[in-house]
């Protein structure tokens, strides 16, 4: 069985526990995912399951990917991801649903692409303190001294500078599954998840 599934982010909400405490949750639409390939130690050197998610038009995929999916009896899919397997492996062409992999109280990690923030300065990008806020300062959100004196006479590699922020692959760990809606394939996890609504994400048990 696969250790995770593919899905997409729906948005954030909140639910109440038995004591009446508010729990902020992220709603994820997970699966159903079709098994496009089963890898074994004999053929591939390791055990894994490749899953396919979300139907697309035939023109949106390559010929190689189309033929690869056709071997499992599947049509064109938007996302292919590989997960390490444990226990009995399903057959190619079968479908894994949310209840096959996850249960309430499972601890998971979620990987997705974070929100893009565009070109940002060091205060927003790296959390620098900036300069004094007084009127006479003229130095509020600048990066400050970074090149030292005439001995290096340059800025070292790796210095935190302004630049494009976000839109990077990000993983959030130790999220707890608090609710599952099997009819609508919805998974409710405590806390925040990278990306905007409809961002494709992978959920994997830790």
Curated annotation (Swiss-Prot):
Looking up Pfam families in the UniProt record yields:
Ribosomal_L3
Q: Which UniProt keywords apply?
A: Ribonucleoprotein, Ribosomal protein, RNA-binding, rRNA-binding
GO terms assigned for molecular function = rRNA binding; structural constituent of ribosome
Against InterPro entries, the record matches this protein to: Ribosomal_uL3, Ribosomal_uL3_bac/org-type, Transl_B-barrel_sf
* Signal peptide region: none
Naming one, the record's GO cellular component terms include: cytosolic large ribosomal subunit
Q: Which domain of life is it from?
A: Bacteria
Q: Does the keyword NADP apply?
A: no
* An annotated GO BP: translation
Which parts of this chain are annotated as the region Disordered?
Answer: 126-155
Q: Which NCBIfam families match?
A: L3_bact
Function comment = One of the primary rRNA binding proteins, it binds directly near the 3'-end of the 23S rRNA, where it nucleates assembly of the 50S subunit.
Q: How does it assemble?
A: Part of the 50S ribosomal subunit. Forms a cluster with proteins L14 and L19.
Which protein family is named in the record?
Belongs to the universal ribosomal protein uL3 family.
Q: Which PANTHER family match?
A: 50S RIBOSOMAL PROTEIN L3, LARGE RIBOSOMAL SUBUNIT PROTEIN UL3C
Sorted alphabetically, which HAMAP family does this protein's record hold?
Ribosomal_uL3_B
Q: What is this protein called?
A: Large ribosomal subunit protein uL3
Q: Which organism is it from?
A: Leptospira interrogans serogroup Icterohaemorrhagiae serovar Lai (strain 56601)
